[in-house]
Amino acid sequence: MKLIIFTGLVLFAIVSLIEVQADNERACLPQYQVCTDAPGNCCSNLVCDCYGRYKSGARRGRNCFCLQKGVIYKREN
């Protein structure tokens, strides 16, 4: 009886560790994907870069995207 309980506890521990590891290995966000709600989820060669949105001089929110590290984007007219 003790062996059955011990085996059950060991199996439960193994399954719990596998689930935790799967949560930690979630897929990263590719380039140009929105990362406003998850700034740390961009792939390793990307950074979550945020920009403020303004309308008539008043701030209306912000947008964040996974972009290449070290690249500067400029607005074209």
From Swiss-Prot:
Expressed by the venom gland. Pfam families: Toxin_35. This is U8-lycotoxin-Ls1h. Residues 1-20 form the signal peptide. It is found in: Secreted. Its main location: secreted. It comes from Lycosa singoriensis. One of its GO terms (molecular function) is toxin activity. It comes from the Eukaryota. Belongs to the neurotoxin 19 (CSTX) family. 08 (U8-Lctx) subfamily. Disulfide bonds: none annotated. Residues 21-26 form a propeptide. Keywords: Disulfide bond, Secreted, Signal, Toxin. InterPro entries: Spider_toxin_CSTX_knottin. Contains 4 disulfide bonds. One of its GO terms (cellular component) is extracellular region.
